[in-house]
Amino acid sequence: MAALYFGDGMNIYFACSITGGREFEPVFQAMVNAMLADGHEIPTAHLATPAVREMELIVAAAEVYARDVEWIRGADVLVAEVSTPSHGVGYEIGFALGLGKPVLACHRRDRGISKMISGNPDDNLTVSQYEMPEEVVEIVRIFLAQHNAI
């Protein structure tokens, strides 16, 4: 599917599990690569790379928190892959929603997710299921097209 977004690129905070769920790395890469190819800025694109754990280990926890909070504040939207439970991703989603940011939480159809995500009635939260990486890329592109006036 071609990119649906026709304006200037958006600033997108991409969130995914770092310490667990790395079997979904090809999905993370498909999502990030599609958003970058469509002209969007993703300060957290490194999360989709195999070296992310080593990269994040050399940064102090307080630095990660301060950096990521600023990136979320500066983002137009937050896009998360939530198939693997993650304290950090849950916090990032809640923080972004608290700021009134649109959030997309994608997960594999065969993986249950926290009811704090699936049961959240916030109008700024979209929860979508997928089976294949190509499907999640289309979901992301549709979500971004719906929020391109931000």
Tell me the role of every PLM-derived stretch:
Residues 2-150:
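Conserved catalytic or regulatory cores that recognize and/or transform ribose-phosphate-containing ligands
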